């Protein structure tokens, strides 16, 4: 096969898969909504089952559900027949995947699920199959033929099933109000998790935070700055509200202007209305704010604008967020 023929064949495979996805797009109906509602109201786990290529797809869908706010596990139907059926509970919901709808092992799982009154969502290419008959809701895989030259190897059907699973998971994620913070809790390691770490995961609190009052002498303010090691201190008023910040840069500018620290108060040197960040905001947002304003520290404040922590650029870089 010449290279141009090889590439054309590969493109044809992809075109067939695109056609399958387009058919899926136009076929979504009230059954999809019913399936999502069952899963949304599930008080237990969402169990995914399937065998062969359908099993691989089911395992991936289960993983996606778990990582986006819907507790889920994969149940291998062959293992289920040898004791793992005990995983099923009456509070669970079951998604069974079989393109033919006649996989014997999967049907055994469905029979047991029905005995426990577990709602069953069947994903199949055959609406007249045994799987469809056992299911409370049927989601049809609208595939005319596979991309395989012999119309045998699961290709279009597996792609469409995976896309349908993603649509289910993402819809549930949206309905449940699953947030970036929720995502970060489930992905603490790796690039995704690091990028979604929050300020409160990294900042310094309590006695570590340098704070002085606006009438504090500059001698005391400098001692506070050097003792805490951040090269800065928050400045608060009598009510404890943040009114400014003093950094190494402020000290240099004050000296360059000919200023003297003798009889000078913190309020005379501080930068008013400093840049701040909230503890529940993304640490990556804090880094961007530092870069945009050419600063290395941010005071962390609560809703009352009271300083509750401090975040240094080194803390963020050490966490390898970017």
UniProtKB/Swiss-Prot annotation:
Protein name, as recorded: Uncharacterized phosphosugar isomerase aq_1546
InterPro entries: CBS_dom, CBS_dom_sf, GutQ/KpsF_isomerases, KdsD/KpsF-type, SIS_dom, SIS_dom_sf, SIS_Kpsf
Keywords: CBS domain, Isomerase, Repeat
A Pfam short name: CBS
SUPFAM superfamilies according to UniProt: SIS domain
Domain CBS residues, every copy: 203-261, 270-322
Protein family (similarity comment): Belongs to the SIS family. GutQ/KpsF subfamily.
Residue stretches in coiled coil: none
Matches recorded under CDD domains: CBS_pair_SIS_assoc, SIS_Kpsf
Domain annotation SIS: ranges: 35-178
KW Isomerase (keyword) present: yes
GO MF: carbohydrate derivative binding; isomerase activity
GO terms for biological process, alphabetical: carbohydrate derivative metabolic process; carbohydrate metabolic process
């Amino acid at each position: 096969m010449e290279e141009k023929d090889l590439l054309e064949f590969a493109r044809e495979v992809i075109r067939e898969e695109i056609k399958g996805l387009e058919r899926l797009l136009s076929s979504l109906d009230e059954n999809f909504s019913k399936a999502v509602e069952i899963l949304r109201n599930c008080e237990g786990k969402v169990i995914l089952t399937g065998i062969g290529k359908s099993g691989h797809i089911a395992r991936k869908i289960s993983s996606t559900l778990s990582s986006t706010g819907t507790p889920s596990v994969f149940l291998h139907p062959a293992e289920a027949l040898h004791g793992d059926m005990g995983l099923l509970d009456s509070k669970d919901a079951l998604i069974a995947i079989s393109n033919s709808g006649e996989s014997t092992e999967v049907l055994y799982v469905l029979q047991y699920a029905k005995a426990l009154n577990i709602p069953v969502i069947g994903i199949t290419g055959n609406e007249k199959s045994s799987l469809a008959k056992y299911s409370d809701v049927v989601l049809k895989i609208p595939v005319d033929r596979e991309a395989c030259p012999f119309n045998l190897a699961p290709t279009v059907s597996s792609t469409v099933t995976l896309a349908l699973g993603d649509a289910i998971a993402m819809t549930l994620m949206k309905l449940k109000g699953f947030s970036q913070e929720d995502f970060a809790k489930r992905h603490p390691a790796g690039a995704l998790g690091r990028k979604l770490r929050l300020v409160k995961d990294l900042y310094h609190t309590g006695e570590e935070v340098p704070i002085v009052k606006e009438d504090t002498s500059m001698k005391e303010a400098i001692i506070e700055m050097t003792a805490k090691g951040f090269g800065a201190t928050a400045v608060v008023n009598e009510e404890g509200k943040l009114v400014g910040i003093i950094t190494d840069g402020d000290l240099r500018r004050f000296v360059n202007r000919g200023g003297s620290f003798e009889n000078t108060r913190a309020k005379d040197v501080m930068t008013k209305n400093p840049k701040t960040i909230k503890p529940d905001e993304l640490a990556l947002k804090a880094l961007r704010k530092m870069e945009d304003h050419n600063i290395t520290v941010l005071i962390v404040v609560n809703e009352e604008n009271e300083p509750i922590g401090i975040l240094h650029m080194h803390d963020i870089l050490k966490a390898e967020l970017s």
